[in-house]
Regions:
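A short, conserved structural fragment
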Residues: 359-369
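Short, amphipathic alpha-helical interaction segments positioned at domain boundaries
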Residues: 376-393
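C-terminal scaffold of the Radical SAM
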Residues: 3-13, 32-54, 58-345
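Minor-groove-contacting beta-hairpin "wing" of winged helix-turn-helix DNA-binding domains
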Residues: 370-374
Protein backbone atom coordinates (compact mmCIF):
# COMPACT_ATOMS: atom_id res chain seq x y z
CA UNK A 1 0.00 0.00 0.00
CA UNK A 2 1.40 3.39 -0.97
CA UNK A 3 -0.33 6.57 0.10
CA UNK A 4 1.05 8.68 -2.73
CA UNK A 5 0.31 12.38 -2.94
CA UNK A 6 0.26 15.00 -5.63
CA UNK A 7 -0.03 18.74 -5.23
CA UNK A 8 -3.81 18.40 -5.62
CA UNK A 9 -4.42 15.38 -3.38
CA UNK A 10 -4.25 15.24 0.43
CA UNK A 11 -1.38 13.52 2.20
CA UNK A 12 -2.66 10.34 3.82
CA UNK A 13 0.13 9.62 6.29
CA UNK A 14 1.05 11.70 9.36
CA UNK A 15 4.03 11.37 11.69
CA UNK A 16 4.30 13.34 14.95
CA UNK A 17 7.57 13.46 16.89
CA UNK A 18 7.22 13.95 20.64
CA UNK A 19 10.78 14.76 21.74
CA UNK A 20 10.64 14.12 25.48
CA UNK A 21 12.13 11.24 27.46
CA UNK A 22 12.35 10.56 31.17
CA UNK A 23 15.97 9.52 30.58
CA UNK A 24 18.20 9.14 27.52
CA UNK A 25 18.92 5.50 26.66
CA UNK A 26 22.55 4.48 26.16
CA UNK A 27 22.06 3.54 22.49
CA UNK A 28 19.68 6.25 21.32
CA UNK A 29 20.69 8.77 18.65
CA UNK A 30 17.18 10.13 18.02
CA UNK A 31 16.52 13.73 18.99
CA UNK A 32 15.07 13.89 22.49
CA UNK A 33 15.42 15.91 25.66
CA UNK A 34 14.50 15.53 29.35
CA UNK A 35 10.83 15.99 30.14
CA UNK A 36 9.82 19.34 31.64
CA UNK A 37 6.26 20.34 32.41
CA UNK A 38 6.50 23.89 31.09
CA UNK A 39 8.47 22.94 27.99
CA UNK A 40 6.03 20.13 27.26
CA UNK A 41 3.14 22.60 27.48
CA UNK A 42 4.91 24.92 25.04
CA UNK A 43 5.51 21.97 22.73
CA UNK A 44 1.82 21.07 22.75
CA UNK A 45 0.95 24.69 21.89
CA UNK A 46 3.40 24.60 18.98
CA UNK A 47 2.30 21.17 17.76
CA UNK A 48 -1.34 22.25 17.65
CA UNK A 49 -0.33 25.36 15.71
CA UNK A 50 1.64 23.21 13.26
CA UNK A 51 -1.35 20.91 12.84
CA UNK A 52 -3.49 23.95 12.05
CA UNK A 53 -1.04 25.01 9.35
CA UNK A 54 -1.12 21.66 7.51
CA UNK A 55 -4.58 20.26 8.30
CA UNK A 56 -6.11 21.36 5.00
CA UNK A 57 -3.56 19.25 3.09
CA UNK A 58 -4.09 16.15 5.23
CA UNK A 59 -6.55 13.27 5.20
CA UNK A 60 -4.64 10.72 7.27
CA UNK A 61 -5.22 7.02 6.83
CA UNK A 62 -2.20 6.26 9.02
CA UNK A 63 -0.91 8.26 12.00
CA UNK A 64 2.19 7.51 14.05
CA UNK A 65 3.19 9.33 17.25
CA UNK A 66 6.85 8.50 17.89
CA UNK A 67 9.70 9.93 19.88
CA UNK A 68 11.03 10.36 22.34
CA UNK A 69 8.24 9.00 24.50
CA UNK A 70 4.74 10.17 23.47
CA UNK A 71 3.21 8.39 26.47
CA UNK A 72 5.05 10.89 28.71
CA UNK A 73 2.53 13.57 27.79
CA UNK A 74 0.12 14.16 30.65
CA UNK A 75 -3.60 13.47 30.46
CA UNK A 76 -4.29 17.20 30.12
CA UNK A 77 -1.72 17.53 27.33
CA UNK A 78 -3.08 14.53 25.47
CA UNK A 79 -6.62 15.90 25.77
CA UNK A 80 -5.52 19.17 24.19
CA UNK A 81 -3.84 17.36 21.29
CA UNK A 82 -6.79 15.04 20.72
CA UNK A 83 -9.34 17.86 20.92
CA UNK A 84 -7.34 19.85 18.37
CA UNK A 85 -7.16 16.87 16.04
CA UNK A 86 -10.92 16.40 16.32
CA UNK A 87 -11.51 20.09 15.56
CA UNK A 88 -9.19 19.87 12.55
CA UNK A 89 -10.84 16.66 11.25
CA UNK A 90 -7.64 14.62 11.69
CA UNK A 91 -9.22 11.72 13.59
CA UNK A 92 -10.51 8.49 12.07
CA UNK A 93 -7.31 7.03 10.63
CA UNK A 94 -7.42 3.36 9.63
CA UNK A 95 -4.27 2.81 11.70
CA UNK A 96 -3.11 5.10 14.51
CA UNK A 97 0.00 4.10 16.44
CA UNK A 98 1.37 5.66 19.62
CA UNK A 99 4.75 4.65 21.03
CA UNK A 100 4.76 3.94 24.76
CA UNK A 101 7.35 3.25 27.41
CA UNK A 102 6.14 0.53 29.80
CA UNK A 103 6.87 2.88 32.73
CA UNK A 104 4.46 5.53 31.46
CA UNK A 105 1.32 3.57 30.56
CA UNK A 106 -1.56 4.26 32.95
CA UNK A 107 -4.99 2.68 32.63
CA UNK A 108 -6.58 6.13 32.37
CA UNK A 109 -4.24 7.27 29.59
CA UNK A 110 -4.71 4.01 27.68
CA UNK A 111 -8.49 4.44 27.78
CA UNK A 112 -8.26 8.08 26.65
CA UNK A 113 -6.16 7.16 23.62
CA UNK A 114 -8.36 4.24 22.66
CA UNK A 115 -11.56 6.29 22.97
CA UNK A 116 -10.20 8.86 20.53
CA UNK A 117 -9.27 6.37 17.83
CA UNK A 118 -5.74 5.23 18.63
CA UNK A 119 -5.87 1.54 17.68
CA UNK A 120 -2.24 0.42 17.72
CA UNK A 121 0.40 0.68 20.46
CA UNK A 122 4.13 0.16 20.01
CA UNK A 123 5.72 -0.60 23.37
CA UNK A 124 9.47 -0.15 23.79
CA UNK A 125 10.38 -3.29 25.71
CA UNK A 126 13.91 -3.86 24.30
CA UNK A 127 14.68 -6.67 26.77
CA UNK A 128 13.04 -8.69 29.53
CA UNK A 129 16.33 -9.19 31.34
CA UNK A 130 16.74 -6.77 34.26
CA UNK A 131 20.51 -6.58 33.87
CA UNK A 132 20.27 -5.64 30.21
CA UNK A 133 17.55 -3.07 30.88
CA UNK A 134 19.95 -1.40 33.30
CA UNK A 135 22.74 -1.72 30.75
CA UNK A 136 20.66 0.11 28.16
CA UNK A 137 19.58 2.85 30.55
CA UNK A 138 15.89 1.93 30.33
CA UNK A 139 13.65 3.30 33.09
CA UNK A 140 11.22 0.38 33.16
CA UNK A 141 11.43 -3.07 34.74
CA UNK A 142 10.31 -6.37 33.25
CA UNK A 143 7.35 -6.37 35.64
CA UNK A 144 6.20 -3.03 34.22
CA UNK A 145 6.12 -4.58 30.75
CA UNK A 146 3.63 -7.26 31.76
CA UNK A 147 1.46 -4.85 33.77
CA UNK A 148 1.39 -2.27 30.97
CA UNK A 149 0.49 -4.92 28.40
CA UNK A 150 -2.46 -6.00 30.55
CA UNK A 151 -3.58 -2.37 30.94
CA UNK A 152 -3.52 -1.88 27.20
CA UNK A 153 -5.56 -5.03 26.61
CA UNK A 154 -8.07 -3.93 29.25
CA UNK A 155 -8.41 -0.57 27.47
CA UNK A 156 -9.38 -2.38 24.27
CA UNK A 157 -6.14 -2.47 22.29
CA UNK A 158 -6.05 -5.56 20.08
CA UNK A 159 -3.03 -4.52 18.00
CA UNK A 160 0.13 -4.20 20.11
CA UNK A 161 3.72 -4.20 18.91
CA UNK A 162 6.64 -5.08 21.16
CA UNK A 163 10.04 -3.56 20.35
CA UNK A 164 12.96 -5.87 21.16
CA UNK A 165 16.73 -5.54 20.70
CA UNK A 166 19.42 -8.16 20.13
CA UNK A 167 23.21 -8.23 20.09
CA UNK A 168 23.19 -6.03 23.19
CA UNK A 169 26.57 -6.01 24.99
CA UNK A 170 26.37 -8.78 27.58
CA UNK A 171 23.38 -10.49 25.97
CA UNK A 172 23.86 -14.23 25.53
CA UNK A 173 21.91 -16.47 23.17
CA UNK A 174 20.17 -17.97 26.20
CA UNK A 175 19.00 -14.53 27.35
CA UNK A 176 17.82 -13.66 23.84
CA UNK A 177 15.86 -16.91 23.54
CA UNK A 178 14.25 -16.33 26.94
CA UNK A 179 13.23 -12.78 26.03
CA UNK A 180 11.69 -13.92 22.74
CA UNK A 181 9.82 -16.74 24.45
CA UNK A 182 8.35 -14.45 27.10
CA UNK A 183 7.47 -11.74 24.58
CA UNK A 184 5.72 -14.21 22.30
CA UNK A 185 3.86 -15.74 25.24
CA UNK A 186 2.33 -12.33 25.98
CA UNK A 187 0.34 -12.70 22.76
CA UNK A 188 1.15 -9.47 20.94
CA UNK A 189 0.14 -9.06 17.31
CA UNK A 190 3.48 -7.65 16.15
CA UNK A 191 7.20 -7.78 16.94
CA UNK A 192 9.85 -5.27 15.87
CA UNK A 193 13.32 -6.65 16.60
CA UNK A 194 16.43 -4.55 16.01
CA UNK A 195 20.12 -5.24 16.24
CA UNK A 196 21.92 -2.71 18.43
CA UNK A 197 23.53 -0.01 16.30
CA UNK A 198 26.46 1.96 17.66
CA UNK A 199 25.69 5.55 16.69
CA UNK A 200 28.22 8.31 17.20
CA UNK A 201 27.56 10.65 20.14
CA UNK A 202 25.87 7.94 22.19
CA UNK A 203 27.24 6.47 25.45
CA UNK A 204 27.23 2.96 23.97
CA UNK A 205 29.40 4.10 21.06
CA UNK A 206 31.88 5.74 23.42
CA UNK A 207 32.05 2.56 25.51
CA UNK A 208 32.77 0.53 22.37
CA UNK A 209 35.52 2.95 21.33
CA UNK A 210 37.01 2.72 24.82
CA UNK A 211 37.27 -1.07 24.51
CA UNK A 212 34.76 -1.84 27.25
CA UNK A 213 33.26 -4.59 25.09
CA UNK A 214 33.66 -6.19 21.66
CA UNK A 215 31.15 -6.64 18.85
CA UNK A 216 30.76 -10.23 17.67
CA UNK A 217 29.21 -10.27 14.20
CA UNK A 218 28.83 -14.06 14.25
CA UNK A 219 26.76 -13.89 17.44
CA UNK A 220 24.58 -11.12 15.97
CA UNK A 221 23.95 -13.21 12.84
CA UNK A 222 23.09 -16.26 14.95
CA UNK A 223 20.65 -14.21 17.03
CA UNK A 224 18.97 -12.88 13.89
CA UNK A 225 18.59 -16.41 12.51
CA UNK A 226 17.15 -17.54 15.83
CA UNK A 227 14.69 -14.64 15.72
CA UNK A 228 13.41 -15.57 12.27
CA UNK A 229 12.99 -19.25 13.17
CA UNK A 230 11.39 -18.56 16.55
CA UNK A 231 8.95 -15.99 15.19
CA UNK A 232 7.95 -18.27 12.33
CA UNK A 233 7.34 -21.21 14.68
CA UNK A 234 5.10 -18.96 16.80
CA UNK A 235 2.93 -17.96 13.85
CA UNK A 236 4.48 -14.60 13.02
CA UNK A 237 5.15 -13.69 9.39
CA UNK A 238 8.30 -11.73 8.64
CA UNK A 239 7.39 -8.97 6.19
CA UNK A 240 10.40 -6.65 6.62
CA UNK A 241 13.98 -6.96 7.86
CA UNK A 242 13.05 -6.29 11.49
CA UNK A 243 9.27 -6.67 11.54
CA UNK A 244 7.02 -9.66 12.15
CA UNK A 245 3.22 -9.73 12.34
CA UNK A 246 0.39 -12.17 12.88
CA UNK A 247 -2.42 -12.88 10.44
CA UNK A 248 -5.96 -12.18 11.55
CA UNK A 249 -7.50 -12.99 8.18
CA UNK A 250 -6.38 -14.70 4.99
CA UNK A 251 -3.24 -16.71 5.91
CA UNK A 252 -1.99 -16.67 2.32
CA UNK A 253 -2.25 -12.90 1.84
CA UNK A 254 0.98 -11.27 0.64
CA UNK A 255 1.23 -9.20 3.84
CA UNK A 256 0.06 -10.22 7.33
CA UNK A 257 -3.03 -8.34 8.45
CA UNK A 258 -1.25 -6.81 11.46
CA UNK A 259 1.65 -5.42 9.42
CA UNK A 260 2.28 -1.75 10.20
CA UNK A 261 0.66 0.17 7.35
CA UNK A 262 2.35 3.43 8.33
CA UNK A 263 5.82 1.96 7.93
CA UNK A 264 4.86 0.15 4.74
CA UNK A 265 4.00 3.55 3.33
CA UNK A 266 7.59 4.66 4.05
CA UNK A 267 9.08 1.57 2.44
CA UNK A 268 6.87 1.94 -0.61
CA UNK A 269 7.80 5.58 -1.24
CA UNK A 270 4.54 7.14 -0.08
CA UNK A 271 4.09 10.73 1.03
CA UNK A 272 4.13 11.57 4.73
CA UNK A 273 3.63 14.86 6.55
CA UNK A 274 5.89 15.04 9.62
CA UNK A 275 5.34 17.35 12.60
CA UNK A 276 7.36 18.11 15.72
CA UNK A 277 11.05 18.89 16.39
CA UNK A 278 13.47 16.97 14.11
CA UNK A 279 10.61 15.24 12.26
CA UNK A 280 11.34 14.46 8.61
CA UNK A 281 8.57 14.15 6.04
CA UNK A 282 8.28 13.57 2.30
CA UNK A 283 5.70 15.54 0.33
CA UNK A 284 5.52 16.29 -3.41
CA UNK A 285 9.06 15.08 -4.03
CA UNK A 286 10.50 17.21 -1.24
CA UNK A 287 12.23 15.95 1.87
CA UNK A 288 11.27 18.34 4.67
CA UNK A 289 13.09 18.31 8.01
CA UNK A 290 12.03 20.30 11.05
CA UNK A 291 14.45 22.04 13.40
CA UNK A 292 16.01 19.59 15.89
CA UNK A 293 15.60 21.99 18.79
CA UNK A 294 12.40 22.17 20.81
CA UNK A 295 12.94 25.76 21.99
CA UNK A 296 13.48 27.05 18.45
CA UNK A 297 10.67 24.87 17.12
CA UNK A 298 8.24 26.38 19.61
CA UNK A 299 9.46 29.90 18.91
CA UNK A 300 9.00 29.55 15.17
CA UNK A 301 5.48 28.16 15.51
CA UNK A 302 4.60 30.97 17.94
CA UNK A 303 5.21 33.29 14.98
CA UNK A 304 2.79 31.23 12.90
CA UNK A 305 5.50 29.70 10.70
CA UNK A 306 6.57 26.10 10.05
CA UNK A 307 9.87 25.31 11.81
CA UNK A 308 11.73 23.89 8.81
CA UNK A 309 15.46 23.29 9.07
CA UNK A 310 15.75 22.16 5.45
CA UNK A 311 13.63 21.51 2.37
CA UNK A 312 15.31 19.35 -0.27
CA UNK A 313 13.78 18.88 -3.69
CA UNK A 314 14.74 15.39 -4.88
CA UNK A 315 15.17 14.66 -8.56
CA UNK A 316 12.87 11.93 -9.89
CA UNK A 317 15.81 9.52 -10.20
CA UNK A 318 17.15 10.25 -6.71
CA UNK A 319 13.67 9.73 -5.29
CA UNK A 320 13.30 6.46 -7.22
CA UNK A 321 16.68 5.25 -5.95
CA UNK A 322 15.69 5.84 -2.34
CA UNK A 323 12.34 4.17 -2.95
CA UNK A 324 14.09 1.14 -4.47
CA UNK A 325 16.45 0.90 -1.50
CA UNK A 326 13.78 1.19 1.19
CA UNK A 327 11.36 -1.15 -0.57
CA UNK A 328 13.90 -3.96 -0.69
CA UNK A 329 13.72 -4.13 3.11
CA UNK A 330 10.38 -5.86 2.65
CA UNK A 331 10.31 -9.63 2.13
CA UNK A 332 8.20 -9.21 -0.98
CA UNK A 333 10.83 -6.91 -2.48
CA UNK A 334 9.72 -4.87 -5.48
CA UNK A 335 7.19 -6.15 -8.00
CA UNK A 336 8.43 -4.52 -11.20
CA UNK A 337 5.01 -3.19 -12.17
CA UNK A 338 4.44 -1.64 -8.74
CA UNK A 339 7.85 0.02 -8.77
CA UNK A 340 7.15 1.62 -12.13
CA UNK A 341 3.69 2.75 -11.00
CA UNK A 342 5.23 4.28 -7.87
CA UNK A 343 8.31 5.95 -9.34
CA UNK A 344 7.89 6.13 -13.11
CA UNK A 345 11.11 4.12 -13.57
CA UNK A 346 11.78 0.56 -14.73
CA UNK A 347 13.79 -1.19 -12.01
CA UNK A 348 15.16 -3.72 -14.51
CA UNK A 349 16.46 -1.00 -16.81
CA UNK A 350 17.87 1.47 -14.30
CA UNK A 351 19.25 -0.93 -11.70
CA UNK A 352 20.10 -4.05 -13.72
CA UNK A 353 23.75 -4.08 -12.65
CA UNK A 354 22.87 -3.56 -9.00
CA UNK A 355 20.35 -6.39 -9.06
CA UNK A 356 22.88 -8.71 -10.69
CA UNK A 357 25.45 -7.81 -8.03
CA UNK A 358 22.97 -8.76 -5.32
CA UNK A 359 22.06 -12.02 -7.08
CA UNK A 360 25.74 -12.91 -7.54
CA UNK A 361 26.24 -12.42 -3.78
CA UNK A 362 23.37 -14.87 -3.11
CA UNK A 363 21.56 -12.01 -1.43
CA UNK A 364 18.75 -11.62 -3.96
CA UNK A 365 16.42 -13.38 -6.39
CA UNK A 366 15.09 -11.97 -9.66
CA UNK A 367 11.96 -13.46 -11.24
CA UNK A 368 9.81 -12.33 -14.15
CA UNK A 369 7.54 -10.44 -11.76
CA UNK A 370 9.76 -9.07 -8.99
CA UNK A 371 13.15 -8.66 -7.33
CA UNK A 372 13.54 -9.52 -3.65
CA UNK A 373 16.22 -10.33 -1.12
CA UNK A 374 16.99 -13.81 0.18
CA UNK A 375 17.02 -14.63 3.87
CA UNK A 376 20.77 -14.01 3.89
CA UNK A 377 20.30 -10.83 1.92
CA UNK A 378 17.82 -9.47 4.44
CA UNK A 379 20.61 -9.58 7.01
CA UNK A 380 22.59 -7.18 4.83
CA UNK A 381 19.73 -5.02 3.55
CA UNK A 382 21.48 -1.81 4.60
CA UNK A 383 24.50 -2.67 2.45
CA UNK A 384 22.27 -3.59 -0.48
CA UNK A 385 20.42 -0.28 -0.12
CA UNK A 386 23.61 1.68 -0.70
CA UNK A 387 23.97 0.09 -4.15
CA UNK A 388 20.52 1.28 -5.24
CA UNK A 389 20.78 4.89 -4.06
CA UNK A 390 21.37 7.47 -6.79
CA UNK A 391 22.73 10.44 -4.78
CA UNK A 392 24.30 12.12 -7.79
CA UNK A 393 20.99 12.27 -9.64
Amino acid sequence: MSYLSTASSPVQSLYVHVPFCAAKCEYCAFFSEPSSGEQMNRFVDALIREMELVASSLKPRTIFFGGGTPSLLSMAQWRRVLEAMERLCLLGADEWTVECNPATVSAEKARLLREHGVNRISMGVQSLDEGLLDRLGRIHSREMVFKSFDRLRAAGFDNINLDLMFAIPGQTMAIWKATMAEAIAMGSEHLSCYEVIYEEDTPLYEQLKAGEFDVDEAVACAMYDELIDTADAAGFVQYEVANFARHAGDPVAELPSHACQHNINYWRGGACQALGPSATGYVDGRRIRNIANTERYCGQLALGQRAHESVEQLSPLASAGETAAFGLRMNTGWPFRLFEQTTGFDLRAGWAGDMQRVVDSNWGVCTDERFHLTRQGMRYADSVAEWFIRPEA
